[in-house]
């Protein structure tokens, strides 16, 4: 079972809900829930086959890119820098699973 992947998905999902409660951005909530769902489904697929990392890798790369750009623009660690950093770590972990 890919506990790290499921934890990452839960963090993304929880973060989108928390962001919605603080700021009230419905599009951000929908996007966060969708990306969290993709990350969770990707973790499920990795749980079944350790080499099936395509969806998880795509999701982490997408989130790292989007949040990395936000971090570069805002210079704020929370939440953009944290999510970008965690996504980069997730990418590294997934690539290592392929080796």
Curated annotation (Swiss-Prot):
The keyword Ribosomal protein does not apply. This is Transmembrane protein 14A. It comes from the Eukaryota. Keywords: Endoplasmic reticulum, Membrane, Mitochondrion, Transmembrane, Transmembrane helix. Signal peptide: none annotated. It comes from Sus scrofa (Pig). One of its GO terms (cellular component) is endoplasmic reticulum membrane. GO terms for biological process: negative regulation of apoptotic process; negative regulation of mitochondrial outer membrane permeabilization involved in apoptotic signaling pathway; regulation of heme biosynthetic process. It is a multi-pass membrane protein. Its main location: mitochondrion. The keyword Transmembrane applies. The lineage of its organism: Eukaryota, Metazoa, Chordata, Craniata, Vertebrata. Pfam families: Tmemb_14. Belongs to the TMEM14 family. It is found in: Mitochondrion membrane; Endoplasmic reticulum membrane. Inhibits apoptosis via negative regulation of the mitochondrial outer membrane permeabilization involved in apoptotic signaling pathway. The chain crosses the membrane at residues 1-21, 24-44, 79-99.
